[in-house]
Amino acid sequence: MSAVPLRNNKAIAADVRSITVLGATGSIGDSTMDLLRGAPERYRVEALTGNSNIEGLAKLAREFNSRFVAVADPARLGELREALAGTGIACGAGESAIIEAAARPADWVMAAVSGAAGLKPALAAVDRGATVALANKECLVCAGDFFMQRAAQAGACILPADSEHNALFQALSSGNREELVRVIITASGGPFRTWAPQDIEQATLEQALKHPNWSMGQKITIDSASMMNKGLEVIEASYLFALSPDEIDVLVHPQSIVHGMVEFSDRSVVAQLGAPDMRIPIAHCLGWPERIKGPSARLDLAKIGTLTFEAPDFERFPGLRLAYDSLRAGRGATTVFNAANEVAVAAFIGGHIRFGAIARLVEATLNDWTRSGNQAPLSSADDAIAIDHDARKRAAGLLPQIAAKAS
């Protein structure tokens, strides 16, 4: 039994739903809080967590009268308590407090803690059978089989919160699994879609951060420029919907209006369209199994005029090929792919490698890990985190060599 409900067969949501937002001060959290702000009569906030933005977290806690608030940095607990003095809001700090927030009795949990740190809190929500809007890539990229099996066993409901997987989630409800031929994830192509490979190699940080359509954080914007993000989304789709790599295609769509498509056996293709606004997929998750009124602009196709599509260029964007390779390799390779990419992006931001070296470092790390013979099935969150740590060490060790070759 899948933890992703591909048919609308769940009871209508309660009049007032209790909500926990893990990662409330990040970009996904900000969009979520904006939606909650628009319907105070419908939602009650149970818990909020943040990384280190005490001022922003405390402001949200006061505004929404949250019952519990946690900050990831244990050293900031005193500041958080001071910021919430006199409110009666319970406070916590550190990993255990973030997990406690996730385990509290909320009907709906937004899992938007970034990085591997988001895995254990998401599992805490899953283990109590919550409805979890999943915006953390690592839960699937690093521990996909294990995470989805655990969700199914606990009776949890996993709702994809990012735009592409939410689009597939909506389109998949038009048919049955045995009728599916393939899913198609769209990609804008990023700022380097038409650049020559040799020019992409030399791209600057400023150029990589100029995404043509989406407003996102620094790391994911760079991932979009390299199309590593699309590779990660291919991996996520495989685990979310139990798809083989051959059942997942990527199509470059510069306008970012069509977010995902599903082809069925009768050759019908069902697509989900919407403006490039993260509040749209989050609103779908927040209202599911109903639909709520969202604040986003309505889609005006006449104004847009033209929608174009093209095949991805694997020479221009080798990261996409590496994602498929790691997915086919299995047994922890996707965890290595993700960890090595994070090390590579940080090195690029820090000025230690060229943009073109990001994919080379990821490939070198995957090859080094494969030669080590450490491949083993994942059976726990600790297994996934151990592989993640090992891959980061390998990538860091290979970094000087990759940087020297590019200089």
Curated annotation (Swiss-Prot):
Indicate which residues the UniProt annotation says bind Mn(2+). D162, E164, E233
* Gene3D superfamilies per the UniProt record, alphabetical: 1.10.1740.10, NAD(P)-binding Rossmann-like Domain (3.40.50.720)
Q: Name one GO molecular function term.
A: manganese ion binding
The pathway is:
Isoprenoid biosynthesis; isopentenyl diphosphate biosynthesis via DXP pathway; isopentenyl diphosphate from 1-deoxy-D-xylulose 5-phosphate: step 1/6
The UniProt record gives the binding positions of NADPH as T25, G26, S27, I28, N53, N136, E138, G217
Q: Which UniProt keywords are present, listed alphabetically?
A: Isoprene biosynthesis, Manganese, Metal-binding, NADP, Oxidoreductase
The record's Gene Ontology biological-process terms are: isopentenyl diphosphate biosynthetic process, methylerythritol 4-phosphate pathway involved in terpenoid biosynthetic process
Catalysed reactions listed for this entry: 2-C-methyl-D-erythritol 4-phosphate + NADP(+) = 1-deoxy-D-xylulose 5-phosphate + NADPH + H(+)
Q: What is its EC number?
A: 1.1.1.267
Which InterPro entries does the entry mention? DXP_reductoisomerase (IPR003821), DXP_reductoisomerase_C (IPR013644), DXP_reductoisomerase_N (IPR013512), DXPR_C (IPR026877), DXPR_C_sf (IPR036169), NAD(P)-bd_dom_sf (IPR036291)
Q: Looking at the record's lineage, which domain of life comes first?
A: Bacteria
Q: Where does 1-deoxy-D-xylulose 5-phosphate bind?
A: K137, S163, E164, S188, H211, S224, N229, K230, E233
The question of whether NAD is a record keyword is answered with no
> Which cofactor is recorded for it?
Mg(2+); Mn(2+)
Q: Which SUPFAM superfamilies match?
A: 1-deoxy-D-xylulose-5-phosphate reductoisomerase, C-terminal domain (SSF69055), Glyceraldehyde-3-phosphate dehydrogenase-like, C-terminal domain (SSF55347), NAD(P)-binding Rossmann-fold domains (SSF51735)
Pfam families from the UniProt entry: DXP_redisom_C, DXP_reductoisom, DXPR_C
Ranges in coiled-coil conformation: none
Known HAMAP family for this protein? DXP_reductoisom (MF_00183)
Task of the protein: Catalyzes the NADPH-dependent rearrangement and reduction of 1-deoxy-D-xylulose-5-phosphate (DXP) to 2-C-methyl-D-erythritol 4-phosphate (MEP).
Identify the NCBIfam families for this entry.
Dxr
Instruction: Say which family it is in.
Output: Belongs to the DXR family.
Q: What is this protein called?
A: 1-deoxy-D-xylulose 5-phosphate reductoisomerase
Which source organism? Bradyrhizobium sp. (strain ORS 278)
The UniProt gene name for this protein comes to dxr
